[in-house]
Amino acid sequence: MTTLFISDLHLTPSRPDITECFITFMRTEAKNAEALYVLGDLFEFWVGDDDKTPFANQIRTEFKALTDQGVPVFFIQGNRDFLLGERFCKETGITLLDDVCTIDLYGTKAVILHGDTLCIDDVEYQKFRKTVHQPWLQWIFKRIPWYLKKKIVSKVQSDIRDDKQMKSLDIMDVNQSEVEKVMSQNCVNLMIHGHTHRPNTHFFDANGAKNTRIVLGDWYTQGSVLQVNSDGFELQNRPFNT
């Protein structure tokens, strides 16, 4: 059996090629998996669980079909879908995990997370993240009419794009010391995350041991899937239909 990991799909109605690749993935290899982990940024931006647009319902349907077949699906919120909550999970049968979570992968303990919390050199983003994760602010936002939330989110998206253009690539990558700290705190030698859109496997010595950090890829130009089984792991691409 194989456990699958994906992240940073950034699903949106304006990119039907990504959606088509995702649906194909869900209806073929995902249905044969032992488990599926989605490590954040499934959506380009998730306004709230009250989103009942045809597109949102289409994605709900795919997850519900998969969990109904007995495949467990686990979800960690990303920086673009941190408002995805228990209502969505109840409707689809998926399980919402903590921001940082440890799991057993065929006898190897691993820590999994979206990855944005590792980018501590981006001080402004970390301040923004701390603000939008305030429970009182989310409580208020969830009670705003959906159409108004959509307008607010569109403005935030525009500001984020402008902000990214002003930042260096190094600042938006993970901080190695923070990586080692999180791995040490969780007593693991394997980390899996997304967020940075820099798919790769990093091997390094730290905390008196050999460590591995696997970075999942984004789905902007092709799909990216991490396959893990008892024999090891492989980070693979999935081409879009042309």
UniProtKB/Swiss-Prot annotation:
Positions that bind substrate: N79, R80, D122, K164, K167, H195
Provide the catalytic activity annotation: UDP-2-N,3-O-bis[(3R)-3-hydroxytetradecanoyl]-alpha-D-glucosamine + H2O = 2-N,3-O-bis[(3R)-3-hydroxytetradecanoyl]-alpha-D-glucosaminyl 1-phosphate + UMP + 2 H(+)
PANTHER family, alphabetized: UDP-2,3-DIACYLGLUCOSAMINE HYDROLASE, UDP-2,3-DIACYLGLUCOSAMINE HYDROLASE-RELATED
Q: What does this protein do?
A: Hydrolyzes the pyrophosphate bond of UDP-2,3-diacylglucosamine to yield 2,3-diacylglucosamine 1-phosphate (lipid X) and UMP by catalyzing the attack of water at the alpha-P atom. Involved in the biosynthesis of lipid A, a phosphorylated glycolipid that anchors the lipopolysaccharide to the outer membrane of the cell.
Native source species: Vibrio parahaemolyticus serotype O3:K6 (strain RIMD 2210633)
**Pathway stated in the Swiss-Prot or TrEMBL entry:** Glycolipid biosynthesis; lipid IV(A) biosynthesis; lipid IV(A) from (3R)-3-hydroxytetradecanoyl-[acyl-carrier-protein] and UDP-N-acetyl-alpha-D-glucosamine: step 4/6
Where does it primarily localize?
Answer: membrane
Enzyme Commission number:
3.6.1.54
Q: How does it sit in the membrane?
A: Peripheral membrane protein
Q: What protein does this entry describe?
A: UDP-2,3-diacylglucosamine hydrolase
Q: A single GO CC term, please?
A: extrinsic component of plasma membrane
Keyword annotations from UniProtKB, A to Z: Cell inner membrane, Cell membrane, Hydrolase, Lipid A biosynthesis, Lipid biosynthesis, Lipid metabolism, Manganese, Membrane, Metal-binding
Under HAMAP family, the record lists:
LpxH
Q: Which GO terms describe its biological process?
A: lipid A biosynthetic process
* Keyword Manganese set for record: yes
Q: Which SUPFAM superfamilies match?
A: Metallo-dependent phosphatases
Please state what class of enzyme this protein is. Answer: hydrolase
Which gene name belongs to this protein? lpxH
Family per similarity comment? Belongs to the LpxH family.
**How is the cofactor bound, as the UniProt entry phrases it?**
Binds 2 Mn(2+) ions per subunit in a binuclear metal center.
Name the cofactor(s) required for activity, per the record: Mn(2+)
Q: Where in the cell is it found?
A: Cell inner membrane
Annotated binding of Mn(2+) 1, by residue:
D8, H10, D41, H197
Q: Name one GO molecular function term.
A: manganese ion binding
Which residues take part in binding Mn(2+) 2? D41, N79, H114, H195
